[in-house]
């Protein structure tokens, strides 16, 4: 399954001229806008994405004129706490669990809040290093979305990708995103996005590639301990792991020697803590 997914990613990359993760990061670091596409079995849409700290009125105007979607600001959980942003709804009923906070506006320096200049100003205020809750008012014309800890390795959304990519670029982990619609108001799909990118000289990246890149270069799971464990089938080595993003624990029972050069059979079972002993 993993191999077939990677083969599909390579085919898409070759067929549509998809940029590498490194190229997308370089574009964001340079203050340019990119297109980011998620999976066909998810929202199957492309968003315009740029690093929030480089936002300009011209960039906002481009997004609303050519992207036509909702201008959102991806923020980390930490930044949302810093700004004391309440969630938009107590119960999130959206299909993909997008974590909208209440919409925001800069407290000073804006007029009605809807102009490109006003929206850029609001974003600049929200991502300033020393930003405080009093710097913003609610509601407003910018829609923050809160990324889950762990980023795309936990949730494969544009929200998490925006924060991940800007952080990987060495920038403030926040991005301005806007969905791309076709002139008739329907969602632009990959072939449409390729044409759009060529028309506006924008590079296209995929969230699938970002997930693969992060999976190959880092891990959110760390080993916290191990000990021998006697079972009805002999002695196993019990290895405990902790998920750094969620704090949840995982237990691996290993029998024999494990080598990266030899394919190792793996069996995955989900047990509650009180069920573990009775099943060993």
Protein language model annotation of sequence segments:
Residues 1-8, 12, 270-273, 277-280:
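Single conserved hydrophobic/aromatic residue that forms the stacking wall/gate
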Residues 56-115:
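Glycine-rich, N-terminal phosphate-binding loop and its surrounding beta-alpha-beta segment
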Residues 35-37, 49, 72, 101-103, ...:
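Structured core elements
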Residues 13-45, 49-56:
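N-terminal, positively charged regions that mediate nucleic acid binding
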Residues 47, 52-57, 62, 107-158, ...:
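Conserved mixed alpha/beta catalytic, RNA-binding, or beta-rich assembly cores of soluble enzyme
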Residues 41-42, 51, 61, 80-82, ...:
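Extended, low-hydrophobicity, polar/charged segments
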Residues 194-198, 202-203, 207-268:
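Long, charged alpha-helical interface segments
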């Amino acid at each position: 399954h993993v191999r077939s997914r990677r083969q599909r990613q390579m085919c898409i990359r070759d067929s549509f001229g998809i940029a590498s993760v490194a190229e997308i990061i370089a574009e964001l670091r340079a203050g340019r806008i990119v297109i980011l596409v998620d999976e066909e079995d998810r929202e199957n849409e492309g968003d315009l994405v740029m690093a929030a700290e480089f936002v300009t009125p011209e960039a906002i105007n481009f997004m609303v004129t050519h992207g036509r979607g909702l201008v959102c600001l991806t923020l980390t959980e930490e930044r949302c706490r810093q700004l004391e942003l309440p969630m938009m709804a107590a119960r999130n009923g959206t299909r993909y669990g997008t974590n909208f906070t209440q919409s925001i506006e800069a407290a000073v320096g804006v007029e009605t809040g809807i102009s490109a200049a006003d929206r850029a100003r609001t974003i600049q205020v929200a991502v300033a290093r020393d930003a405080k809750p009093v710097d913003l008012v609610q509601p407003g014309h910018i829609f923050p979305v809160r990324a889950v800890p762990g980023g795309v390795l936990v949730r494969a959304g544009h929200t998490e990708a925006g924060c991940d990519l800007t952080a990987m670029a060495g920038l403030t982990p926040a991005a301005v995103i806007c969905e791309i619609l076709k002139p008739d108001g329907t969602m632009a799909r990959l072939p449409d996005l390729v044409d759009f990118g060529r028309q506006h000289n924008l590079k296209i990246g995929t969230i699938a590639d970002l997930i693969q890149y992060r999976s190959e270069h880092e891990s959110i799971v760390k080993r916290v301990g191990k000990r021998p464990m006697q079972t009805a089938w002999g002695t196993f080595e019990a290895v405990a792991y902790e998920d750094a993003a969620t704090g949840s624990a995982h237990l691996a029972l290993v029998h024999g020697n494990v080598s990266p050069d030899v394919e190792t059979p793996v069996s995955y079972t989900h047990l509650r803590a009180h069920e573990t002993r009775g099943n060993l």
